[in-house]
Amino acid sequence: MKHVRLLVFTLLLLPALAAGQQSAPPAPGATPPQTGTTPPVSARVSLDDAIRMSLQHNHALQALRSTIQQSLAEEITANLRPNPTLGLDAQFLPIFQPSQFSSDYIDQQAQFDAGVGYLFERGKKRQHRLQAARDQTALTRSLVSDSERQLVYNVGQQFVDVLLAESTLEFAQQDLESFKKTVDISNERFRVGDMSEGDFLKIELQLLQFQSDVSAARLARIQSLAALRQLLGFESVPDDYDVQGTLDYQPVRADLTGLKSVAAINRPDLRAAQQAVTAAESQLSLQKANGKMDITGTFNYTHTAGVNTGAFYYSMPLPIFNRNQGEIARAQFAITQAQEQAGETAQQVSTDVVQAFANLQTNDQIIQLYQGGYVEQAKKSRDISEYAYRKGAASLLDYLDSERTYRANQLAYRQALASYMLALEQMRQAVGTRNLP
């Protein structure tokens, strides 16, 4: 009896143990299975990170890269041989006189034919088709590379815009906090009768301008980050992402001749223009091959009157009128067009380098002017006027004028730094590489 009760108790306990095992929490340190990847909670993106993300996640670029796979698929099509043809027929069957159906009738009276045909391409058409497709693939790769170059430039440009917006916002917030202290001091002077009500109202109204500057700078930062995220791919960064970096001046010492040489080697659009000439020449060779008449060969087996026979047939169009003259002429003019476009692209590359170099030099000179003393002079003038005003030794108008001059100088200096960094990005785009000589 004890054994029976023990057996019943065990059977009742097993389901509970199984349920407990199924619902048991994971062990400490165990990692649950990942069903998908999600962006981090927060992220600070550097310029190099932004470029890498855009090349990996930008949907427009990904769509364009698919054209390379399409060109590779066209190479497969171009290399295919013609399919053979199969023909079957049965003649003189007594369909309307079924009583005559017999093995003797089928053997002696009916006729059966079976034939196999094949198109023999002349002029090495398949080889020329494949070469033309390969040249088109090479051209497509270069065009995609040029789109990557344009995307990298756009990312760099937008990244600098974000840095400028953040620098402007930081300065506006600092300026607002500093001016609030001036308002507090002015309020105390007005309370003790050391300042007129009109002057105090001017101070308070000026505070509105500082607050408006902060709001405008904050909006510019949000818009710049959104525009940059569009280039990076929205799913590659979290909603509250930020950039890592500051407005910086990095002098570049390079000569124009060396930059032109680098551009001639690295610019993918120039390479694409040269490959377009090669592709046009391949098309001309293909059209000349298409002018060669193909031969169709057929072997036909026939059974009739109890006799099995075979026959060979060959056919070829006579090239009297159509020898593909029009397409050959068109391909020749296409070569001329591609050559002219390649020359135009080479000139455009030189023009881009010259313009970018001049822009970089001009912005470099402007930075030198600001760093040569104008920034410090404006700050020193503002500090002196602020100290004198707080001590009652300067008028309100003099102080406000020095404050406006300082703000304008700081904003212009930040804009000059951003313009220089944009000019540097333009130079990198013009030479086709981020590693300047």
Describe each region flagged by the PLM.
Residues A63-A78, S147, L151-A172, K181-V183, ...:
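Amphipathic alpha-helical coiled-coil segments
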Residues P32-A43, I76, G87-R122, R129, ...:
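Small/polar, glycine/serine/threonine/aspartate-rich low-complexity segments that form flexible
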Residues A217, P268-D269, A338, A416:
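Metallo-beta-lactamase
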Residues S42-T67:
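Mature N-terminal segment immediately following signal peptide/propeptide cleavage
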Residues S54-L55, G117, L139, M195, ...:
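Amphipathic alpha-helical coiled-coil scaffold segments and their short linker/junction regions
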Residues H3, V144-V262, N359, N363:
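Periplasmic alpha-helical coiled-coil/stalk elements that build and connect Gram-negative outer-membrane
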Residues K2-L11, G20-S23, T37-P39, A412-P437:
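Acidic, low-complexity, intrinsically disordered peripheral segments
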Residues P15-A16:
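N-terminal signal peptide c-region/cleavage motif recognized by signal peptidases
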